[in-house]
Amino acid sequence: MKPAVKRLALAVPIALAVPGTALAQAYQCRVPDRIELPRPPRQDSTTVRAPVARYTLAVSWSPEFCRSQRGKAANDYQCSGKIGRFGFVLHGLWPEAAKGPSPQWCALEPRPSIEDIRTNLCMTPAPSLLEHEWAKHGSCMAVTPAGYFKVASILWNSLRLPDADKLSRREGLTAADLRREFVRRNPGFTESSVGLQVSNGGWLRELRLCYDKDFMPTPCPPRGFGPKGAVPLKIWRGL
């Protein structure tokens, strides 16, 4: 077991002590009886091995993703409605370096098992993405896919995510409004720990939640923090 997994195992009681923990962000997610392993992921950039200084938990707003990605085979579970209708889903957990390129593509083996995919499909409803996230990011912080997904799921299940549908109807919604609502629901965070990724048109794509190497919320680096303060924000409902 790598140090990252050990540290989070010790933090489990803290994570689960958060009041009102959300159990899932899927609408009636139903794991299919039969799941096929996707093709092995293709390494799309060079291997980087570097000390891990912090982590990013990337939480995707599924209606915005599916708005442009619906109809693609790799996104069928997430976007077709066959196994459920999704709001926020987990994109991935990424180890980050203090400076310079972050760790990536440390190993392509072992691959996630069918059981790994089945266990985590309602959290990340795309088998090919689960494969990719393990190979590109998880292999640099855990020995096995199961260990990596355990860390990610503990962080995921400790969150109380905002009611994005309700926020989307607020007139004059800003980036600060979303950050304040997230912090209200998750008192361990500050607004500086909540990065946002938006489209060129100002639509919410992802929350980028920042943790230190002990998996405690920490201020995000300026790069990638996203829109600040009173910058207008839009949220596509699509449900």
Predicted feature residues:
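Extended repeat- or IDR-based interaction platforms in eukaryotic proteins
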Residues: 1, 17-18
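Bacterial N-terminal signal peptides that target proteins for export
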Residues: 1-10
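Bacterial N-terminal signal peptides
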Residues: 9-17
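Sec/Tat signal peptide C-region and signal peptidase I cleavage site
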Residues: 20-24
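N-terminal module-boundary/linker segments of secreted carbohydrate-active enzymes
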Residues: 25-66
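Domain-level detector of nuclease and nuclease-like folds
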Residues: 71-239
